[in-house]
Amino acid sequence: MDDSEFNALAEQALARIDAALEACDADLDFELAPGGVLEIEFADRSKIIVNRHSIAKEIWVAARAGGFHFRWDGASWRDTRDNAELMEKLSTLASQQAGEAIVLR
């Protein structure tokens, strides 16, 4: 995958996450900053940070539960450790951090 393809796919993923956060009812604040960094802040002031890492061609997620790297497999973004899909993993991480069920679609 070349840089332009990675950037397009990463931007689509970040936009999808942003739209899913808009649609959920959870008590959280979020902002997608230029350059591909998405900060999600929870009621307890903890954060999840989602950003693209162009050199590795991965999307990185930093949460209270740890750091996660997602790589494009040709169809979806998958965790490099357990092969979990990005939106499913973010839903799990956000639910753990918020203390309530959060489903991002």
UniProtKB/Swiss-Prot annotation:
GO terms for biological process: iron-sulfur cluster assembly. It comes from the Bacteria. Keywords: Iron, Metal-binding. Pfam families: Frataxin_Cyay. PROSITE patterns: FRATAXIN_2. InterPro entries: CyaY (IPR047584), Frataxin/CyaY (IPR002908), Frataxin/CyaY_sf (IPR036524). SMART domains: Frataxin_Cyay. One of its GO terms (molecular function) is ferric iron binding. Coiled coil: none annotated. GO terms for cellular component: cytoplasm. The keyword Metal-binding applies. HAMAP family: CyaY (MF_00142). Belongs to the frataxin family. Involved in iron-sulfur (Fe-S) cluster assembly. May act as a regulator of Fe-S biogenesis. This is Iron-sulfur cluster assembly protein CyaY. The gene is cyaY.
